Amino acid sequence: MSRFFSKKYSALTAYVPGEQPKDQKYIKLNTNESPFPPPQSVVDAAKSEAAMLQLYSDPECTPLVKKCAEHFGVKTSQVLMTNGSDEILNFAFMAFCDAEHPIVFPDISYGFYPVFAKLNGIPYEEIPLREDFTINVSDYVGIGKNIVIANPNAPTGIALPLSDVERIVASNSDNVVIIDEAYVDFGGESAVSLVDKYDNLIVTQTFSKSRSLAGGRLGFGIACPEIIADMNTVKYSTNPYNVNRMTMAAGYQALVENEYFANCVEIIKQNREFTKNELESLGFCVLDSKTNFLFAKSDKIEGKVLYKELKSRGILVRHFTLDRIKDFNRITIGTLEQMQRFIETVKNIL
């Protein structure tokens, strides 16, 4: 680091994203992207804005917010569009957390949560998952601190039922509860239906997973109008034009193409069950996933060794070094052909 780097960030361990190889020789099963491209109408919508890139985008994302509100059955004042769901999460941390308002989250979850906390000088606590990697809801009921929970969780893939989410939200009425629903379309229950009932609830989602726009960077939050206004204050104090014109147009059209994306999700879910069954037949322990990935380990091979062997054979998966999960690998679900290739490669390695 340089001699000018602020001391408040010098001890910060940055988030480490999944590998993005520059060549095309790998089957990428490591970053939970969709294996399916967006439909042509979405591509065309993005292209239609390219000729106007000399102009700033609409900071309010007006047509997209209206379409998103219509899609989810909420008011436009309850929606905030952002540059990926990471940005809405960071806005929430900045707006509602500080030394007097710490935040808690599971010890095995999205790696950005502790980074956001440290970046913004927010005290935080990581609450251990149970031995089976499920969340103990009682740990969060009435805890009296801000909360963020990924549901379904990542990297485990395990989902909480909506009734448990509501218990947590209802019992912490004086604190903000953020439900990160990046993977909800693959089998989870969305908490959007609870937003009108609880003014302390923020639901975040992304277009990166089920709507094939990871490269476009588009996410959003749904909450009561007052919460959205607070986060807009943070947004307009940092990056008013946070969603570019092409992404905004692509996102709008992606909300039109519901049938296409629902079909893609169904195929991914089928491929997930195929892969799970095949891995279990090989002796793997595979957690119950409601996402577009599987979290699996084998007693026959260490997690890091399997990761390296797969990479040497042209397949990327995600390995984590955290002690409790170091024997696991997270496997994104791709096309059936990709998953068949993955299974055959695993068989050869074992």
Model-derived segments and their meaning:
Residues M1-L55, I143:
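N-terminal "arm"/small-domain region of PLP-dependent enzymes with the aminotransferase-like
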Residues E60, N200-E280, F284-L287:
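PLP-dependent aminotransferase class I/II
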Residues A95-A150:
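PLP-dependent aminotransferase-like
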Residues S163, K308-R313, R318, L322-L350:
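PLP-dependent enzyme catalytic core of the Aspartate aminotransferase-like
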Residues I268, S281-R313, N329:
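Conserved PLP-binding catalytic core of the aspartate aminotransferase-like
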Residues T134-I143, P155-V177, E181-L213:
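Active-site pre-lysine segment of PLP-dependent enzymes
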Residues T62-P102, N120, K300:
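Phosphate-binding glycine-rich loop
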